[in-house]
């Protein structure tokens, strides 16, 4: 019993340490997304034109948005609800959930700011590629974690914003359309059968993919 008790205590300590690190990672990512959204707004409004390194700032902001979505938020939300890490997150209660909600709000602000840039500035391929993959990762995210207490409506807003961003890139960059379509179709094929049903993925005009 003493041994079992020690194992339980160690598990509790590891869970607490994991949540502390996750909380810090979410906090830092949220701050980074706020900075990225600020850069996008400055570029869209023309306020950053006097900054000699505007191109580098924009590139770094796009790269950070891609990393946060593709390598951070989406894998976290796609986590199997039955896995141990997901259970740890569920059991932490409001503090971590509120932090995650704030992160999603920052991600929404950032994704909402990008289409204005794509409409006004000719982006290079180095910036288009991460934007496309970031948008697609959100579009095809299963959001398993959100169905267990975290605000799913907020992520749906991010999904719609990402679809608008991808549509903007697709319309404005004809030379990129072929590979974008190939990646979208490849992602659709990989989806479970129930998620390939009509009405799940819609395009402009109300038609289904």
Regions found by a protein language model. Name each.
Residues 1-209:
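Eukaryotic alpha-helical solenoid repeat scaffolds
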